[in-house]
A protein has these predicted regions:
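Ankyrin repeat boundary signal
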Residues: 82-83, 114-117, 146-150, 177-180, ...
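Ankyrin repeat domain, specifically the short helix-to-loop turn at the C-terminus of the second helix
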Residues: 71-79, 104-113, 138-145, 168-176, ...
Length: 255
């Protein structure tokens, strides 16, 4: 009796014919095309732009002084006192980036805390003073921001970078001339450290104490010497000699 071909043997035999090879090749090509198409589809879907979170959009707008976007976000309920991922509040960030238009929009919002500080204890006025951003400092003062604070102050920061115009403005608004940092460093010491002769003179003329020392026993002249600022050393030495002569001249004559 002849063996009756089974279904599996029939398919196996057919696969070894030229027609069978062509059929299998066509199937494989079809599968490959489908897989390739699927891969491209995955790549395409994976490359679709991800919508930025509102907070990220707000932070970017603050950095680039995009006041329209900031106003839009605020109108939609964004917290003007929110911080970035480094803990920096929006107003402080605006001051750091000199984003004056955004600064105006933020302080115009009644919910904004103009005294808010970052993790380092710095507020917007301090960074505006450090950057020499007079308009930002004026904006904050107009909104009632304090020119004095415990520890480091805006006057320290303005003096550190020799921004005489801001030093003058802060003094006009009753900035404490001999404010002490946590270790007793004064604005005059910061001016001396940076070699800012005109700033040191400005502070001295406003009543800064040239003899005051910080917690490690350094005065302004010591700072100038330590940081190798010869012009400041010369100016402070001359001022000290002048003061000594005045004191000697005002002393009562010995009987």
């Amino acid at each position: 009796m002849k063996n009756i071909p089974t279904q599996s043997s029939t398919h196996t035999d057919a696969a070894h014919t030229p027609a069978g090879y062509r059929a299998h090749a066509a199937v494989r090509r079809g599968v490959a095309r489908l897989a390739l198409a699927g891969g491209f589809a995955c790549m395409t879907f994976g490359a679709l732009p991800v919508q930025a979170a509102p907070a990220d959009t707000m932070i970017k707008a603050v950095k680039f002084d995009d006041v329209k976007e900031v106003q839009k976000q605020l109108s939609q309920g964004m917290d003007p006192n929110m911080t970035d991922d480094q803990g920096m509040p929006l107003l402080v960030l605006a001051a750091r980036e000199k984003s004056d238009q955004v600064g105006q929009a933020l302080v115009d919002n009644p919910k904004t805390n103009v005294e808010i500080v970052d993790k380092a204890g710095e507020n917007a006025m301090m960074l505006a003073a450090l950057n020499g951003d007079m308009d930002f400092v004026k904006l904050l003062i107009a909104k009632g921001a304090e020119v004095n604070k415990k520890g480091w102050t805006p006057l320290h920061y303005a003096a550190a970078n020799g921004h005489d115009d801001i030093v003058t403005l802060l003094i006009k608004y009753s900035a404490y001339i001999d404010a002490g940092s946590p270790n007793g460093t004064t604005p005059l010491m910061m001016a001396a450290r940076g070699g800012h002769v005109s700033t040191a003179k400005l502070l001295l003329d406003a009543g800064a104490d040239i003899n005051v020392k910080n917690q490690i026993g350094l005065n302004a002249l010591d700072f100038a010497k330590q940081y190798k600022e010869p012009d400041t050393v010369k100016g402070l030495t001359a001022r000290m000699e002048q003061m000594q002569k005045q004191q000697a001249g005002s002393a009562p004559a010995a009987q």
